[in-house]
Amino acid sequence: MTQALAGFNANGLFLATDSRATRFTAGGQPEFFHLQKLFPLGENCAILGGGAGVSVPLSLALRQEIDRRRGLNDLEEIVEFALPFLSQGYGAYLRHHGPEPEGFRRVYFIFAGYDPAMPPPGYQLFLLGSEDNELPLRLIPAVNQVVMPRNLGMEMRLHQALATGLPLEQLLQISKDFLEKQAQIKEEVGPPFYYATITAAGYREITL
């Protein structure tokens, strides 16, 4: 599974995620391993996959297809293309492998980006997801923040932090503290943690 969060204000957009993933042995026992879940899409956009582990190969397949289709740079156009692409990929995975064990039947993708042609501040977040292996994936409303899986306490804290105009450095530190706390109480969440920002200067990986 994944613990991920993203948000933006006038100072920029940030993304943060853990790297622990779960697979199951032939006997149905969970095994944990680590993999990167956060990837740039061009210069000003990013995708963060979460939930079922298949989100990562689907994210990489989407990135490869976007790279192949030159000119697909606008985040809204990317999301419009990604919705059927990821739905088809997830459907093929389920047909081949069957449903995941109970409690692991969620997959989601956070799309983030900057577009100078949009009204200020020019940042966007989109969330595509599926619960209980539902197909096709759905576009889930997101305004200027996403916390997945949802955590009401963190959502309130992040809402206040964004509203007060905290700089990206402080928003990233809040995210780091949250991820570390979740790793202490949830075995499916763990380091290393990955962070990135998107500003008018583009996508940037951050080390904390």
List the model feature ranges, each with a label.
Residues 1-208:
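N-terminal nucleophile
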